[in-house]
Amino acid sequence: MTSTQEQGPDIVSAPLRDAATVVLVRDAADGIEVFLQRRVKQMAFAGGMTVFPGGGVDKRDADADLAWTGPEATWWAGQFGSDAEIAQALVCAAVRETFEECGVLLATDADGAFADPEGLAEDRQRLVEKSLSFAQFLTARGLTLRADLLRPLAHWITPVNEKRRYDTRFFLAAMPDGQHADAETTEAEVARWVNARVAIDSWAAGQHFLMPPTWSQLNYVSQFSTIDELLDAERVIEPILPNVTPGAGLAGLGFPGSDEYFRTLGDQQPPEITL
C-alpha cells in the first residue's frame, strides 16, 4: 500500500464500501478533456465537490449472467488486487454509474453498434431507482458490456477518520463516438467537459474544489497529449490510503503528491463556488 495509515486513539473506522469511478476523456484541440461534475451540496459524501462520474457497487453488479467483451474478471482482479467476483462488480458498477450519471453507455448491440442512450431513458431511471439491475438491463436490450473500452487507472481508499468510506477503483474510458455526456442527474448541479490542466488551474484559482483523488487523476491525465497515449500507457495500480493526522483536518492528510497539492491549495477550504 502506497501510504501507511496512522490512527489516533479516538478514530473508529467506518466500514469500507467498494466503489467505481470513471475518468471519461476525449481529445480536443487544446489537449485531453475530462468530463467533470460538481456534486450538489446536499450530498452526504463530497457535497459541492468537483468529481468524475461514479458511485458505490450494487451487490447485483456481481451477477455474472450478462454478455461481456474484453478482459475477463480475473484480469481486472489482478489489476486491482481483489477477487474475481468483486472485480466483475467493479467493472459493471463503472459502466452502470457512467450511464446513470451522464448518459454514456459503454455497451454495444449484436452488430457492435453503440446503443442510443436517448431511447433508454426509462431504463436509465429504473437503474437509478434500483428497480432494475444492470445485468437485467443489458440482457433485456441485447447489449454487451464493453470491458475492453475501460482501462485501470488508480485505487484510492477513504481515510479512516471519514464517516463514509469507500474502496474506490478508478477507470479510464474514451468517450464513444455518437454519444453525448449530459447533466441529467440529481447528484450534480453542473457537468461539463474541461481540459485536464485547465481544471487544475481553475481549482488553484479557487473556482471550484478538488479532493485529492480527483486532483491526482487530473494531474496524471494532464501529462498526456492524446487519448491514445493515455490509454496505451502502462500503469501499476497500488492502493493509496492517505495518512491521517488526528485533529488537523484536510491539511493533516498525507498521500503521494500531497506536498504539491497543499502548496497549490494554499489557504483554500471546500468553498461554495462554481465549476
Task: Label each region the model flagged.
Residues 1-275:
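N-terminal leader/linker segments that precede catalytic domains of diphosphate-processing enzymes
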